[in-house]
Amino acid sequence: MQSRYILLVAVATLVSTQETSGATLSMSSSSPLNEHESIRINHRFLRTHTEDHAVEEEERAPWDFKKFSANLADLGKLKLPDLAKLKQSLPDWDKIAGYGKATGTAAKLASAKSFDERLAIINGVKDIDEMNALFLMTKPLLKNVLPDYDDTTSLEALLRMIKSSDLDDDMKALALIAFQRYEGSLKAGTSKLDVNP
């Protein structure tokens, strides 16, 4: 179905391009025979083609107060939407903001040169939504490094997996600190994360 729309848009673009180029060529090749045949100079042409777009008085519908008040009464009978359902249908802006912050934090982590810089960046994350978004971003990488990892892995099991992995010591320590912070964010359940590594 979408390929038909794409084809339709491509054909419409091609046709409009050909029509425009043809119109440009035909306009450039046609020139008025004398100055009176030009539209700008031919005042009679302009006078004869003026149109009145105003609505005639008898074409307007008469204003009816009874009909207007009946419509207002009908509006008063309308049922208002349930605010709880409306709130559930709206996006969670805190989570969206958390993803934005997590993207910035991931960029900082990628550009950090030393272990201390990375540790300071991870310790600087105080928002639970940001920590959760960071974890979701790095989850595929974590599964590549630790194939036995899944969502039910405890901190002790993860500690054993990290120790037995072939990561260097700085990366092992950083991974443990980050996972402790993530686990603390799940336990905290508040908007701010004050768990020390």
UniProtKB/Swiss-Prot annotation:
The keyword Nucleotide-binding does not apply. Keywords: Host cytoplasm, Secreted, Signal. It is found in: Secreted; Host cytoplasm. It comes from the Eukaryota. Residues 1-22 form the signal peptide. A motif (RxLR-dEER) lies at residues 44-60. Its main location: secreted. One of its GO terms (cellular component) is extracellular region. Induction: Expression is induced during host plant infection. The keyword rRNA-binding does not apply. The RxLR-dEER motif acts to carry the protein into the host cell cytoplasm through binding to cell surface phosphatidylinositol-3-phosphate. Effector that is involved in host plant infection. Triggers cell death strongly in Nicotiana benthamiana leaves. Belongs to the RxLR effector family. This is RxLR effector protein PITG_08174. It comes from Phytophthora infestans (strain T30-4).
